[in-house]
Amino acid sequence: MKGRIELGDVTPHNIKQLKRLNQVIFPVSYNDKFYKDVLEVGELAKLAYFNDIAVGAVCCRVDHSQNQKRLYIMTLGCLAPYRRLGIGTKMLNHVLNICEKDGTFDNIYLHVQISNESAIDFYRKFGFEIIETKKNYYKRIEPADAHVLQKNLKISSPGQNADVQKSEN
């Protein structure tokens, strides 16, 4: 299936499309606050279009936790018939490019249902690693456990390592 993949802004005019996509793609339902927040994150939320049809979306937020600036991928998904066409890759690359241009993010992370092997494989291709598994993360879906996948964006500078070596001598 050949086609044109484009990313578009999420606006009050198309937020209902995002809601419908999320209802179909994800086993979890998102509340009104989720969608209100999505309208305020700018480039961190995008609808994905395949030949002008909305088929997927990515929604992220900036998270300041663990004394770090982190990007949290709340949702990234695509309708089943449109998977493996490069749409997820385009959405993830968009988010990674934002982080790279910004230059101040320590890492990017997300939760994935432990049974979702295709998602886990997808993120691993981009350098994400499973850093922990949260028991009973999801309510009302099975399996309820989620892996936390993370990609580190900051490489510790050589100067820091040199200091550590000096103090050991």
From Swiss-Prot:
Substrate binds at Y30, M74. Its main location: cytoplasm. It catalyses: N-terminal L-methionyl-L-alanyl-[protein] + acetyl-CoA = N-terminal N(alpha)-acetyl-L-methionyl-L-alanyl-[protein] + CoA + H(+); N-terminal L-methionyl-L-seryl-[protein] + acetyl-CoA = N-terminal N(alpha)-acetyl-L-methionyl-L-seryl-[protein] + CoA + H(+); N-terminal L-methionyl-L-valyl-[protein] + acetyl-CoA = N-terminal N(alpha)-acetyl-L-methionyl-L-valyl-[protein] + CoA + H(+); N-terminal L-methionyl-L-threonyl-[protein] + acetyl-CoA = N-terminal N(alpha)-acetyl-L-methionyl-L-threonyl-[protein] + CoA + H(+). CDD domains: NAT_SF (cd04301). Its EC number is 2.3.1.258, 2.3.1.-. It is an enzyme of class 2 (transferase). Residues 137-140 are annotated as: Substrate. Belongs to the acetyltransferase family. GNAT subfamily. This is N-alpha-acetyltransferase 50. It comes from Xenopus tropicalis. The lineage of its organism: Eukaryota, Metazoa, Chordata, Craniata, Vertebrata.
